[in-house]
């Protein structure tokens, strides 16, 4: 019998065509519990459906996911309607879901909510019990698996932020039956190490079953009773476990937990330099301001000192003296001008000037000036005044001019 050789692509396409032609697989209704739920930024939803013995990968595209009437959650029992087909590129078959009906809440989810409510009522989640996260830790305890990416991520973050921080690793199981016990033991041991400042409890992402060790009641009490502050970084940002609610600080990822626990040395140095610069500037401004005040007060004191007052008064006296001299000089000049003007006026009206022109003056014997002939009728003698002397004359007759 001749067997035809197929390429991988041909084989996957053949299986796909076979499944797509099957009536039952094209109209499948599958009941199971949701796990590994991931909602992509594109809007597509990826998850697994499982029961006690098996699981199948599922995808629900955005166009169908848009019509969902409720939010999907890990641990939720649902009935998924769709078709089974092959993803040719990977050679894997999966359920392409078109609709989902809620069947009920899964057993793990019920147990999770029950324990969460119990511990909440007991006050284990209250903020008043949260211990303060130290800002400058020197030694950080880490409880996680010694293998895998989580520990490497924490170490890398620590080296990048501060090489001087010491990590004390407690290797623990993070999945399986004995995982909770080893996590509790790690908390107890690290609490006995005196110089451990803070503890990181970490694990990578996974399904609700894979993270179930962190939903243990005894572990929750161990976290609550820890003398050292505990940061949890369990799973991805959308994953929440019981210890996340009890811990002193919940980080969305293990790397984020390391970011919180380990202070950035460069940032601290820059902050110190900024503080130093600000203090220096503040002190310089204060000194400058006080110096200005001092100079102002000094000027006021100097201005009001007896010596300055006397000097200023002397200056005032000199100014007044100068002003007085100016006024006196001005007054004298004014009076000189007036005197000169009056002298000129007096000179202009001086009778002697008239006599120089050949005229004479007549006075009686009492030296009274005679200006009219009528006055002569009463006199016998008169004085005649010339420019260069006088003569006494006797009146013999008086002649009157015709008008």
Swiss-Prot record:
Q: Name one GO biological process term.
A: DNA catabolic process
Q: Name one GO cellular component term.
A: exodeoxyribonuclease VII complex
Q: What are the EC numbers?
A: 3.1.11.6
Q: Where in the cell is it found?
A: Cytoplasm
Pfam families (UniProt xref): Exonuc_VII_L, tRNA_anti_2
Its function, per the record, reads: Bidirectionally degrades single-stranded DNA into large acid-insoluble oligonucleotides, which are then degraded further into small acid-soluble oligonucleotides.
Subunit info here reads:
Heterooligomer composed of large and small subunits.
* Superkingdom of the organism of origin: Bacteria
What are the top taxonomic ranks of the organism?
A: Bacteria, Bacillati, Bacillota, Clostridia, Eubacteriales
**What keyword terms does UniProt attach to this protein?**
Cytoplasm, Exonuclease, Hydrolase, Nuclease
Listed GO MF terms: exodeoxyribonuclease VII activity; nucleic acid binding
The record's annotation in HAMAP family points to: Exonuc_7_L
Top enzyme class: hydrolase
Gene name on record? xseA
The entry's family comment says: Belongs to the XseA family.
Q: Which PANTHER family match?
A: EXODEOXYRIBONUCLEASE 7 LARGE SUBUNIT (PTHR30008:SF0)
Keyword Hydrolase annotated: yes
Against NCBIfam families, the record matches this protein to:
xseA
Annotated source species: Clostridium botulinum (strain Okra / Type B1)
The protein's name in its UniProt record: Exodeoxyribonuclease 7 large subunit
Per its record, the protein catalyses:
Exonucleolytic cleavage in either 5'- to 3'- or 3'- to 5'-direction to yield nucleoside 5'-phosphates
